[in-house]
A protein has these predicted regions:
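Glycine-centered short loops/turns at secondary-structure junctions
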Residues: 36, 82-84, 164
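Active-site cofactor/substrate anionic-group-binding motifs, chiefly glycine-
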Residues: 36-79
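Glycine/small-residue-rich loop that forms an oxyanion/phosphate-binding "nest" at active or ligand-binding sites
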Residues: 80, 85-109, 115
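Single conserved hydrophobic/aromatic residue that forms the stacking wall/gate
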Residues: 180-187
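Glycine-rich phosphate/adenosyl-contacting loop at the front of the ribokinase-like
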Residues: 1-41
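Conserved phosphate/ATP/ADP-binding segment of small-molecule kinases
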Residues: 100-178
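A generic structural signal for well-ordered alpha-helical segments
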Residues: 32, 77-80, 160
């Protein structure tokens, strides 16, 4: 299945708009290039709607969060939704601070995300409206492991169904759940 997904990306060579963590921006660009896409980075509110319009998808990462980037995230997300483009959210640090948590919750309320990926604490914060995260790391008491795997799978399936999105919990074990796919998306 992964080969088919990569073949599809290479065939379409989409431009992907990224509003991402400044620390990883180069890595994100290189991964997109390696997969056959073409990255462009912009979080400037006056720029994002135009940039999003020429792209095939949007990647939003809360790693480097500030008020200007939030405005850019919302504008780009709304424009992507208008265009029917897939939108990915990485809610870095949701649950670690009120500012990050409120931002992540506002984003998932206002924007339809195709993919939501984060550690278990971040995803639970999105699902329940509050949570605790140790910086950008999951709370170790919540980590997905062999003992709680079935419970974690039930949780992620329920959240994926509620958000009509592919949901990925990252960690030692990486459960993925999807219930609805649009014509242009591949699991």
């Amino acid at each position: 299945m992964l080969k088919e997904c990569l073949d599809q990306v290479r065939k379409k060579a989409p431009v992907v708009h990224n509003i991402t963590n400044y620390v990883t921006v180069n890595d994100v660009a290189n991964v997109i290039l390696a997969c056959g896409g073409s990255p462009i980075m912009s979080d400037e509110p006056e720029d994002v709607a135009d940039i999003t319009s020429i792209c095939g998808g949007l990647n939003i990462n809360l790693g480097t969060l500030h008020k200007t980037s939030i405005e850019g995230m919302l504008k780009a997300g709304h424009r992507s939704n208008e265009l029917g483009h897939p939108v990915l959210l990485d809610p870095v640090g949701a649950g670690a601070s009120r500012f990050r948590t409120e931002t992540a919750l506002k984003l998932i309320k206002e924007i339809k995300f195709s993919v939501i990926r984060g550690n278990v604490s971040e995803i639970k914060t999105l699902a329940y409206g509050s949570g605790s995260t140790k910086g950008v790391d999951a709370d170790l008491t919540e980590a997905v492991n062999e003992r709680n795997l079935q419970q974690s799978i039930s949780f992620i399936k329920g959240f994926a169904k509620k958000k009509e999105a592919i949901v990925i919990i990252t960690g030692a074990i990486d459960p993925v759940s999807y219930t609805h796919l649009r014509a242009h998306e591949t699991p």
